């Protein structure tokens, strides 16, 4: 097979920025088969597979890419499916540039192989062309409960179901999917794709109990007692939003990014028939610089805002959001106000947001995170007229589970403490992973935690 030594990735087709910023349809349109084969031939099949070491779920990346290069897309899917239960999701939202693609040898001098784009292509091809029922393993007679139907919980559920466990997933919201459903906009991750992944788990025998808030409706002790579960996996995520404690933060027109995106993504607040409409306003300031901030800003634009600012205390180079998401936001007309930080949100006579006062920042010496610390420039305050403020400053785990589970150790941030990478907690038979343990992180890292915990749960039950 001849290699393709083009220094750049095959470009991803996308909607025109001036069209897509007015709709919620997916921005990236995906590779054609010809594009996928051509991009796959850029892989030089390193013997030590550095890309695989960057994948939290351990996909054999050179093997699946080799099948793509040969045009055998179903074989490529089967390789991915051995390690990942959500390839169509990961191909769209994982930060490949800091994981698998960040380890790619081609990326040392040129652009890395488009691993994420190829994973998405393979998953979409399988979804559209293969309609066989999943293999349901014989029951092994054991029951496991999963708390939370997000990436960690879905992955653990899938891996345990493949081993014959009777798995029930308890989800607090009215639909399964967790952050994949409520946190990531349709234009980045179509919900039909997430739903199809969940439907696949149902076909494998996984049960989903929605509107079940563990810690209120039931406790972990009850699940392991009268309900008879031999182990419980806590993958309840981190959905408690953080704020800055600014004057004016309680004004009407101030949202957490969590609430704003949940209303838009899960409750379809952009439809005229929505029972939970969002008052977006005409000028919106989004405080923060991560992927969630980009999602909130780009959603606000699509909801009718005329001007949307990203307010971030460091510079463009320090933005934690994926490079691709920043580029898409810039193309769509989002204005980046970097090296500034809000100090007050000002009210109008009607009690709604009227403006936001910020102070200019400069970068000092590196802090504990390794990034240069932002320092206020005295006397540099300025005010921007805005009528909506969205705070995107991260999230913490909900305290319900830790407050209703005696003996479950948590740290000062409210995250569940686990031993090693297997997710074992201070309570026997209780495992945890994903954002409930790490705080807000990536989808693929949560999946990796769910996968490791499923393996540990299987060993625990078999050795009881």
Predicted regions and their residues:
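FAD-site-proximal beta/loop scaffold in flavoenzymes
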Residues: 250-281, 366-440
């Amino acid at each position: 097979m001849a290699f393709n030594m083009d220094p750049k990735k095959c470009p991803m087709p996308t909607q025109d920025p001036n069209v897509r910023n007015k709709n919620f349809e997916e921005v990236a349109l995906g590779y054609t088969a010809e594009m996928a084969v051509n991009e796959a031939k850029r892989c030089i099949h390193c013997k030590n597979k550095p890309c695989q070491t960057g994948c939290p779920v351990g996909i054999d990346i050179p093997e699946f890419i080799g099948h793509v290069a040969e045009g055998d897309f179903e074989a490529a899917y089967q390789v991915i499916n051995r390690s990942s239960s959500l390839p169509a999701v990961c191909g769209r939202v994982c930060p490949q540039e800091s994981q698998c693609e960040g380890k790619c040898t081609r990326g040392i001098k040129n652009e890395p192989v488009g691993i994420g784009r190829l994973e998405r292509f393979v998953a979409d091809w399988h979804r559209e062309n293969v309609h066989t029922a999943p293999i349901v393993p014989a029951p092994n007679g054991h029951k496991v409960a999963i708390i939370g139907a997000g990436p960690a919980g879905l992955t653990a559920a899938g891996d345990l179901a493949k081993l014959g466990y009777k798995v029930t997933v308890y989800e607090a919201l009215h639909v399964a999917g967790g952050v994949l459903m409520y946190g990531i906009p349709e234009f980045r991750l179509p919900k039909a794709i997430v739903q199809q992944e969940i439907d696949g788990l149902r076909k494998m025998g996984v049960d989903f109990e929605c509107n079940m808030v563990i810690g209120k409706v039931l406790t972990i002790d009850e699940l392991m007692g009268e309900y008879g579960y031999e182990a419980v996996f806590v993958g309840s995520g981190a959905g408690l939003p953080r704020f800055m404690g600014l004057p004016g933060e309680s004004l009407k027109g101030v949202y957490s990014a969590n609430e704003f995106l949940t209303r838009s993504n899960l409750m379809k607040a952009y439809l005229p028939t929505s029972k939970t409409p969002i008052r977006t306003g005409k000028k919106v300031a989004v405080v923060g610089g991560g992927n969630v901030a980009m999602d909130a800003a780009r959603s606000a634009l699509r909801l009718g805002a005329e001007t949307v600012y990203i307010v971030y205390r460091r510079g463009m180079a320090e933005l934690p959001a994926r490079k691709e998401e920043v580029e898409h936001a810039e193309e769509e007309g989002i204005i980046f106000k970097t090296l500034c930080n809000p100090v007050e949100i000002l009210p109008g006579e009607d009690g709604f947001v009227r403006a936001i006062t910020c102070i200019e920042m400069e970068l000092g010496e590196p802090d504990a995170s390794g990034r240069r610390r932002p320092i206020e420039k005295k006397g540099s305050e300025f005010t921007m007229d805005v009528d909506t403020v969205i705070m995107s400053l991260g999230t913490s785990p909900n305290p319900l589970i830790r407050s209703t589970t005696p003996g479950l150790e948590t740290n000062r941030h409210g995250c569940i403490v686990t031993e090693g990478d297997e997710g074992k907690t201070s309570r026997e038979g209780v495992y945890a992973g994903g954002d409930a343990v790490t705080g807000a992180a990536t989808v693929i890292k949560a999946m990796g935690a769910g996968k490791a915990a499923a393996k540990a749960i299987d060993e625990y039950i078999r050795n009881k």
